[in-house]
Amino acid sequence: DDAKFYYGADGKRVNYIGWQLIDGIYYYKEGNQFIRNQSKKIKGDWYLFDLQGKMVTGFSTPEITSEYDDNYYYYGNDGRRQFYTGWQLINGKWYYFDESSRAAKGWKTINGVKYYFETITKATDEYNNEYFVGNSDHFMYTGYGIIDGEFYYFDANGACQGIDTSYTG
């Protein structure tokens, strides 16, 4: 049987149904088992539970569940799936979501502007060049760009080639 049970500090099995807060982590119990390795609609909202049954927050990734479909979806701090579209500022970083609420990844052209997205880590290419998407203007630098008062040089693909101390603008 694939059942997983939890026991309280008193050594007794937890038998409650519904949301469970165990050691600061939320789980959801249905029948005699905790929901694991799947998304679940609960009272009108979608939640994702990992292989151990922990409620997921942040971006879904392949390591979280075997239900993963090679797309990134975002779950808020309360665990509810967010059905974002367009540009979203999350924890100080910009992300772009398509009409199906999937976070953009790889190269995308949006409103005629080319961007490179890596949803979980910084944007890089296969050569580990770094890319920069401006926090307010949503653009990809090519040529010289100023970031935090420093002059950087970006190649035609937007790959950062480093700080240029000789450039005066």
Indicate where each model-derived feature is located:
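Extracellular adhesion/carbohydrate-binding repeat motifs centered on closely spaced tryptophans
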Residues: 1-169
